Amino acid sequence: MYTTSILTFIFATISVAFFTYRIVQKMKKSDNATEEYFTGGRALTWPIVAGSLLLTNLSTEQLVGLNGDVFGDKALVGLAWEALAAFAMIATALIFLPRYLASGFTTTPAFLEKRFDKTTRSIVSGLFLFGYVTVLLPVVLYTGSLALKSMFNINISLWLIVIIIGSLGSAYAIFGGLKSVAVSDTINGVGLLIGGLAIPFLGLSALGEGSFLNGVSILLNDKPEYLRVLTRTNLDESIVSVPWPTLFTGMMFIQIFYWSTNQVIVQRAMAAKSLAEGQKGVLFASAMKLVGPLMLCLPGIIALHMSELPIGRQDQVYGAMVRYVLPDWSLGLFAAVLMGSILSSFNSALNSASTLFSLQFYKGYINQNASGEQIVKIGKKFGVFIAIASMMIAPLLAQTQSVFQYLQKVNGLYSVPIIGIFLLGISTKHVPAIAAKVGMFVGMAIYAFFSFENLHNVHPFFADASGDLHWLHGYFISFVSAIVVMLVIGKYKPKTADEIAISDQRDSTPVDMTPWSGSKKASAGIMGMTFTIYILLSLVAE
């Protein structure tokens, strides 16, 4: 890296920290220490909710992983991860968020305690923590380090970069709380939107030998099959990572898990100052997800047309593209933007993990009389512990072929049972707590079978590239099995009328529960735009 790039990187990173500090100091503070630290005092407005949602999700595990998958697929099927996310976010805004806010919950598992029992909440909280420590946090650290290393060809150990990023992210989350995390997310989000969109623009210009329009023409006319969004196989007749049948099985449910029940994501919306502000933020973020493929998929497609890029494995595509198209003077600035997205996802997951441990396990079992200050103190200590654990695990991910597929597959082990009990908790009243527990373990066991043994030589319609049952179909079968088990138990051993009455009781909520009047129209518009994008790309790829 040149001196100018280093100075630009340092200046931009410090500037974000400075403006975050100034903005947070001016925001309304809650007298409740726990509420202030873990939900930002419930003072977030819709732009901050939207910005934090987007940047928590839009990080290097997406930029590196999804662009790599698109490149490896030689097709645009990865668009489904963004398009169906928009649908799941609509469900969050209209269905899940009103139920979470109605009782003033601080965590999503708290809803399960109300609907089922404390043990169910504890099991789900434990599963979330397992996922954050073994999957989400290490993946963010690994992909972030890999992106920075490949962008600048830095001759530094991956371990060292992981430690640097992990330490910086920990400082935001542990010492600043959710409010600092959300504000820094919003500031970094603006930079990432500008910088992220610049990469495909410059890539198309480079493809067109200096002409953006020529680049677009090449993209549309030279092997337009690369733009297929609904297909099972690519030009090489290889089965792609997201065959179109999976859109109607596991894909939709894994999106609902991530956007509607995952503590890391939903905690931002739960910190909104009112239901209307939360719905506006979630739906604006949903609309912006439709812009996401320009950053998360298009660079991978452009790279397919650029044989001169030095790409050893597919997860190196994004870093190679950035290094190829950006002028030297701007590398430091983009590195700061990328660092912001890395820190955002890392510190968001860290804050959510601290929230779950402190409120569920420490307050719930270890010290039930703990004060707000004690809970926050323990949360910070636990944050340090899992930050160190994730830094130790992250470099081990270098052994995986596709880090994005690793993220989604391992997530399935605990998300299958979680999404099932959340959906039944919202849609039914008679399913008892024992059904939730049995259903969770049945779902996990069946998904574990598909992950480690699987069905071999299945019909091509249901197969992955190796001929085994595609993992998203396995996810769907596991999910349906868990639901069936819970419903059967609920039929023969339903809740009593008294138990249902207790579940229906609502605690007081600290926020205004008036919904946003434009939420349904906005949702319809987002769905219409999604279908239009699919139709247009399908026509172009023919």
Language model segments and positions:
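Membrane-embedded helix-loop-helix hairpins and adjacent transmembrane boundary segments
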Residues: 1-542
